[in-house]
Amino acid sequence: DSGSAIVALTNDRDTSYFGEIGIGTPPQKYTVIYDTGSSVLWVPSSKEQDFIEATDETDNVFLHRRFSFWLNRNVDEEEGGELVFGGLDPNHFRGDHTYVPVTYQYYWQFGIGDVLIGDKSTGFCAPGCQAFADSGTSLLSGPTAIVTQINHAIGANSEELNVKFGLTPEQYILKGEATQCISGFTAMDATLLGPLWILGDVFMRPYHTVFDYGNLLVGFAEAA
C-alpha cells in the first residue's frame, strides 16, 4: 500500500501517548510509546529465546517517507491522539507547516533562534541553539539558565510565552492534584552539542508535527 496508515493514540494524563504494534506471524500486539527521541524499539520478551534480528531492511511501504503526530491535550476525550505513517491528516492542523532542515540525523534535530519570555528577548539563543522534537518526552527541556527564567516568569505573572512558536499558560502548565499545577519546563544541561532543547509533548500538543524522512525536514503547524 503506497498510501498512508493511521494509528490511534491513547493519552495517559498528558504525560505519555501510547499506540499498538503487531510483531510476528500471526502478529502479537504490544502497547508502545512511538518515541521520536529513540532509535530503539523496546518490547517485553521471553528470556533465552532464539531469534533472528533484521537490522537493515527497507520495504518502501509508503509512497511518502514521512509521518506526523497530533497529540490531544483533552484527557477526557476518547481520541487521545493520532500518528499517521506516510502522510498528514488535514483534520488535525490549520494552515501550512513551517519546515526546518534536520541538522543531526541521530535525532530529529534542528536549529532554533532566540528565546522570548513575553515579548522580551533573553538573548540566550540569539547566536543559535539546537532542538529536537521528541514524542517520548512529556515536558519541554532546556538549559538551566533559561528554564530558570521561564519558571520564574510563570510564577510571577503567568504571561504568554514564546519559544519560536507561541505557547500559552494553558499549554505549558500541567494539571497535578486537585490544588496543584506543574510547570511543563525542566532544566537539562548534559549535552556535547551545545545548548539543546527537547521539544516534548508540551510543545507537540499545540503544534501538529511532521517528520519528513525523505527530505530530512521537521514541520510544525497549529494543531486543530
Curated annotation (Swiss-Prot):
Its EC number is 3.4.23.-. The active site is at residues 35, 134. Aspartic protease with a high preference for bonds between hydrophobic residues. Residues 1-221 form the Peptidase A1 domain. Keywords: Aspartyl protease, Cell wall, Disulfide bond, Endoplasmic reticulum, Extracellular matrix, Glycoprotein, Hydrolase, Membrane, Microsome, Protease, Secreted, Vacuole, Zymogen. GO terms for biological process: proteolysis. It comes from Cynara cardunculus. Heterodimer of a light chain and a heavy chain. An intermediate form is produced first, and undergoes proteolytic processing to remove the internal plant-specific insert (PSI) and the propeptide. GO terms for cellular component: endoplasmic reticulum; extracellular region; membrane; protein storage vacuole. GO terms for molecular function: aspartic-type endopeptidase activity. This is Cardosin-E. It comes from the Eukaryota. Belongs to the peptidase A1 family.
